[in-house]
């Protein structure tokens, strides 16, 4: 685990990604998260296991290229993101959608 995230594992995971492709992965116990672009696989594994109390058996990460963004005559780049697909052990799950009993 890198020294950067040793103190605060909650800073590793930014948010879960809820897309059509990511939702299909839920059937086979795969969850997709947007993570800090400096996080390594051991950091992501430690953060998911500690925050959600589950057992991680595999992680795939990808760094898509940054996209250009233009507002008027000013151009810039969007923030760099890293996607992590986390595979959980059999019998473990993360509740992404809270049950609404209203």
Swiss-Prot record:
Gene Ontology molecular function: any one: structural constituent of ribosome
Query: What GO biological process terms does the UniProt entry carry, in alphabetical order?
Result: translation
Q: Which UniProt keywords apply?
A: Ribonucleoprotein, Ribosomal protein, RNA-binding, rRNA-binding
What disulfide bonds does the UniProt entry report for this chain? none
Q: Which HAMAP family match?
A: Ribosomal_uL23_B
This molecule's function is given as: One of the early assembly proteins it binds 23S rRNA. One of the proteins that surrounds the polypeptide exit tunnel on the outside of the ribosome. Forms the main docking site for trigger factor binding to the ribosome.
Q: What is this protein called?
A: Large ribosomal subunit protein uL23
The taxonomy runs: Bacteria, Bacillati, Cyanobacteriota, Cyanophyceae, Synechococcales
């Amino acid at each position: 685990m890198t020294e950067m995230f040793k103190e605060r594992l909650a800073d590793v995971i930014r948010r879960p990604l809820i897309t059509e492709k990511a939702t299909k992965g839920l059937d086979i116990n795969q969850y997709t998260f947007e993570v800090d672009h400096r996080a390594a696989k051991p950091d992501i594994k430690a953060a998911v296991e500690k925050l959600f109390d589950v057992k991680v058996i595999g992680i795939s990460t990808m760094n898509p290229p940054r996209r250009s963004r233009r507002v008027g005559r000013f151009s810039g780049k969007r923030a760099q993101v890293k996607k992590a697909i986390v595979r959980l052990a059999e019998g473990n799950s993360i509740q992404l959608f809270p049950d609404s009993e209203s």
